[in-house]
């Protein structure tokens, strides 16, 4: 079976919980006990599926299999250092999130990122001694030529997200990359689970895109993603298309803290009971669980990372459910 029987709509949770809505995201690439619900914040400034909806008319997704021939030129390579890219277009996604398209130096260039990897942004505020650095995972395909797309949530008092939101087409931002994350290859795991909060969906999206655009990759994916309101759900159209196209291989479960009256999904918080119901069991062979979200969510679900290169110990709900260190990756 694809997974244990899953219940799409759960009853609203009644127990009190500690809220994480306004907790800023961890600055890295991308709950107190088992019965505490976790409110998922609707954003993570970080640490990528296809480009089913782009700006304006829409853009054809990059080819699923690279054509034979010379490797395309890469805009970003670590040895190049920071590269200034010009903002080409901006789309307002919701009240605090924008989608931004940056032109690569040449039309036939690709970004240079791979799956899974992120990039680093840099700018120096006026009067500051040091520049601000923040990682983001693009949502455009790694094979896409000519541009890269970011989804960025604006945080109150967040210097980088505020700066990016204030950019207008024609202005530039410095980028460096790729920042390696989890090295993905086709069929590396037969079943992966993804737990995301807000824009923590971006590194998950990057891996999902690689899986489902590759005909040779048969990996199954279970996604649990939490947000505050329905308008905060990012890439929902693409995720719905995936469910319709691959019903035996992809399932998405949405959790809203403040759902509309007609909401048919899960209401409230991501809980131990929900994850126990929908995720692959820890005893399944060679599974992987990816987690990406704000610090409060990470602490409650899996435990936080110690640093970009140190995953830290596994704790929280996933440990209580029996998942081991080597089964979990934190973005």
Curated annotation (Swiss-Prot):
Give the main location.
mitochondrion
Question: What InterPro entries does the record tag this protein with?
Answer: CBR-like, Cbr1-like_FAD-bd_dom, FAD-bd_FR_type, Flavoprot_Pyr_Nucl_cyt_Rdtase, FNR_nucleotide-bd, OxRdtase_FAD/NAD-bd, Riboflavin_synthase-like_b-brl
**Broad EC category:** oxidoreductase
What does the record give under GO molecular function? Answer: cytochrome-b5 reductase activity, acting on NAD(P)H
The cross-references to Pfam families, in alphabetical order and at most eight, read:
FAD_binding_6 (PF00970), NAD_binding_1 (PF00175)
Task: Share an example GO biological-process annotation for this protein.
Answer: ergosterol biosynthetic process
EC number annotated for this UniProt entry: 1.6.2.2
UniProt catalytic activity: 2 Fe(III)-[cytochrome b5] + NADH = 2 Fe(II)-[cytochrome b5] + NAD(+) + H(+)
Asked if the keyword Membrane belongs to this entry, the reply reads: yes
Report the locations given in the UniProt record.
Mitochondrion outer membrane
What UniProt keywords apply to this chain's record, in alphabetical order? FAD, Flavoprotein, Membrane, Mitochondrion, Mitochondrion outer membrane, NAD, Oxidoreductase, Transmembrane, Transmembrane helix
Which GO cellular component does the record give, naming just one? mitochondrial outer membrane
Q: Where are the transmembrane segments?
A: 36-56
Binding site residues for FAD: 188-223
Name the membrane topology term. Single-pass membrane protein
Q: Which residues form the FAD-binding FR-type domain?
A: 80-185
**Signal peptide (from-to):** none
Q: Which cofactor does it need?
A: FAD
Q: Does the keyword Mitochondrion apply?
A: yes
Instruction: Tell me, in a sentence or two, what this protein's role is.
Output: May mediate the reduction of outer membrane cytochrome b5.
Q: Which family does it belong to?
A: Belongs to the flavoprotein pyridine nucleotide cytochrome reductase family.
PANTHER family registered for this protein in UniProt: NADH-CYTOCHROME B5 REDUCTASE (PTHR19370), NADH-CYTOCHROME B5 REDUCTASE 2 (PTHR19370:SF171)
Please identify the protein, giving its name as recorded. NADH-cytochrome b5 reductase 2
Q: Which organism is it from?
A: Pyricularia oryzae (strain 70-15 / ATCC MYA-4617 / FGSC 8958) (Rice blast fungus)
Supply the gene name: MCR1
């Amino acid at each position: 079976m694809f997974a244990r029987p899953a219940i799409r709509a759960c009853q609203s949770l009644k127990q009190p919980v500690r809220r994480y809505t306004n907790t800023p995201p961890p600055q890295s690439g991308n709950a107190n006990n088992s019965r505490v619900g976790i409110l998922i914040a609707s954003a993570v400034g970080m640490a990528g599926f296809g480009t089913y909806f782009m700006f304006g008319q829409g853009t054809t997704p990059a080819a699923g299999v690279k054509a034979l021939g010379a490797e395309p030129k890469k805009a970003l390579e670590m040895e190049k250092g920071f590269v200034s890219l010009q903002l080409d277009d901006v789309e307002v996604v919701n009240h605090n999130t924008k989608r931004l398209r940056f032109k690569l130096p040449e039309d036939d260039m690709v970004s240079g990122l791979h799956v899974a990897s992120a990039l680093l942004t840099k700018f120096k505020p006026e009067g500051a001694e040091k520049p601000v650095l923040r990682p983001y995972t693009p949502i455009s395909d790694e094979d896409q030529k000519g541009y890269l797309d970011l989804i960025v949530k604006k945080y109150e008092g967040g210097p980088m997200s505020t700066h990016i939101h204030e950019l207008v087409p024609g202005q530039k931002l410095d980028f460096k990359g790729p920042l390696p994350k989890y090295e993905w290859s086709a069929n590396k795991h037969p079943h992966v689970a993804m737990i995301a909060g807000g824009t923590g969906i971006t590194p998950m999206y990057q891996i999902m895109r690689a899986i489902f655009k590759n005909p040779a990759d048969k990996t199954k994916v279970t996604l649990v993603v939490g947000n505050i309101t329905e308008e905060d759900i990012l890439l929902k159209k693409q995720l719905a298309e995936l469910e319709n196209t691959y019903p035996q291989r992809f399932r998405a479960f949405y959790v809203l803290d403040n759902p509309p009256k007609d909401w048919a999904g899960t209401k409230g918080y991501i809980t131990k009971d929900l994850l126990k119901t929908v995720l692959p069991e820890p005893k399944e062979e060679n599974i992987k669980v990816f987690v990406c979200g704000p610090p409060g969510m990470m602490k409650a679900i899996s435990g936080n990372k110690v640093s970009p290169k140190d995953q830290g110990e596994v704790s929280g709900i996933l440990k209580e459910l029996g998942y081991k260190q080597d089964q979990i990756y934190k973005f």
